[in-house]
Amino acid sequence: MNRKEKVWKYYFGDCTKAVDAFGVEIFKDRYVDENINTSKISGCWTIDHIFPLNPSDDNVINRKGSNSIYNLQPLSFISNQKKGSRLNGKVGNITYAVKIIEQINNSVVGKMMVKVDGAWYWAYE
């Protein structure tokens, strides 16, 4: 099983379509590489590093996200582009914040929270 299959199965099991953390519908068979322009193709998804490999937040100097399955999540291509390498912000009308769950040396595993109707929830739970 390759990485994209592992990530999809970890979050969605055997489903062939799902909704990402920002409420965008994605389809298992529409995985795309991050470098492909897919802005006009509905339902495409890619793998996001929850805690980015190279965070754009100055408060986390010397910390980088890991490639562990626990630091990866499926996001629609557009959601992933909007989230970028930020640890908090807004995608569409959903506010998000990344929390550090585990750190081994300088490699970090993160988990994302989303704010819906004024309340914070762990994404995908």
Question: Regions from the language model: what does each represent?
Answer:
Residues 59-70, 81-125:
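Polybasic, low-complexity binding patches
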